[in-house]
UniProtKB/Swiss-Prot annotation:
CC annotations in GO: extracellular space; secretory granule
Post-translational modification, as annotated: Specific enzymatic cleavages at paired basic residues yield the different active peptides.
Record PANTHER family: PRO-OPIOMELANOCORTIN (PTHR11416:SF7)
The species this protein was found in: Neovison vison (American mink)
Protein name as catalogued: Pro-opiomelanocortin
Family per similarity comment: Belongs to the POMC family.
Upper taxonomic lineage: Eukaryota, Metazoa, Chordata, Craniata, Vertebrata
Phosphoserine: modified positions: S41
Example GO molecular function: hormone activity
Tissue: ACTH and MSH are produced by the pituitary gland.
Propeptide: 1-8
One Pfam family it belongs to: Op_neuropeptide
Localization annotation: Secreted
Keyword Flavoprotein carried by entry: no
Amino acid sequence: SEPGRREGKRSYSMEHFRWGKPVGKKRRPVKVYPNGAEDESAEAFPLEFKRELAGERPEPALGPEGAAEGMAALADLEYGLVAKAEVAEKKDDGPYKMEHFRWGSPGKDKRYGGFMTSEKSQTPLVTLFKNAIIKNAHKKGQ
């Protein structure tokens, strides 16, 4: 009776999806630490001392698992430094570029909320107002 109860629970918990169960796993964000390497000395030493320690580390004495972790920590440290340099370069490029639209900036008619409005729908309203004004003027004239 245990698997049946689990299936019942699953179908209940998936009812908030529109077409049944979700496809694939939920993506979890990758944790990015600002200080780069993840070891015990991360809090104790500033960035310059960590670089010196990484250079003086005797890799053959660590063993196969320790060497792999040491290389991964070095790669993470380098990746963090390269990413920071790229961000600094991008900030100095100049004016803001609209890169979040697929083919550059949107058209002038679409810029300020123009996605939802259409100009054709306003013409009947204008004619209605014109007719009301004309009728009102005729009534006052008589």
